[in-house]
Amino acid sequence: EAYVFGPGGGAEGDTNTKGGAGGYSVGTINTSAGGTLRIIVGGAGGPGSQSNGSGGGYSGVFTSSWQGNSPSTDHAAAIIVAGGGGGSADSSTNADGGGAGGYPNGQQGSPSGSGGGGGTQSQGGGYPGNGNGSCTATCTGTTLRGGTGCGGAEGSGGVGWPAQIYGGTWSSAAGGNGCNAGGGGAGYYGGGGGGGNPNGGNGGGGSGYIGGSGSYTVSNGAGYSGNFDVPATQATSSPYYTTGISRGGIHNINNGGNGVHSGGHGKVVLRYFA
């Protein structure tokens, strides 16, 4: 049995904002003798180079084909995944904050006009390309990676592991260019980065997955979605939940146990039955 908690997204370092919570996925993995599983525990998002919040990484159980250097290969190796929460934007008016990771879809970041879309089972969350700013990187979510927020000066700082291992500025917050938005959370498909009208769109949450890979099938699978910075009730009521994990970051509050502004890391628990 696998109990997979996604990591939370980061809050913005200057204003009263919140990152999104991580998703939660459970299921029984049918394994074969001598098989190898790779366990990925996602890291929380934190403030990026422009203080806006970056997206959380993803947590999951993968086949041995996961190597951390090819998004397409790693994506095909997914057995069960929980998505990360989206990062917050530089705006105290969009109080709901980054979208939570979830299943089947991640949650859209707030507000509806400029929040990044949640990842789905078949594609990354959309980028609301609007407003006065411009997106200078890849702002639409994709396989295992969240989109970059609208603005400039993106960077891998604050991005939750393992979203940044594939290169680029995926899941990064951004700022300037008339736009200050949060990064999308990573996941089976990542959430979109926030847009700019109204200024300060929050990132969308990444999607979970319970579909197995090859001979590693999943039975009794279920996935759950958080609501902005709060993880799903099924996650927090699990006997394997640890205080602070999966929570979205909150400005100036150590909500995730990793310091102020940062979300809570992910967690993976496996129970083996002979």
Predicted regions span which residues?
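Surface-exposed loop/turn motifs at beta-strand-loop junctions within extracellular Ig-like
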Residues: G6, V41-G45, A274
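Contiguous ligand/interfacial binding patches
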Residues: G193, N199-H261
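Secretome/extracellular-domain signature
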Residues: G13-R145
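Beta-rich globular "head" domains
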Residues: E1-G10
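Short, structured beta-strand segments at or near domain termini in extracellular proteins/domains
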Residues: S59, S262-A274
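Extracellular interaction modules
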Residues: D74-A76, N258-K267
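Acidic, glycine-rich loop-and-strand cores that form catalytic or ligand-binding grooves
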Residues: A77-I80, Q108-G187, G191-G206, G212-Y224
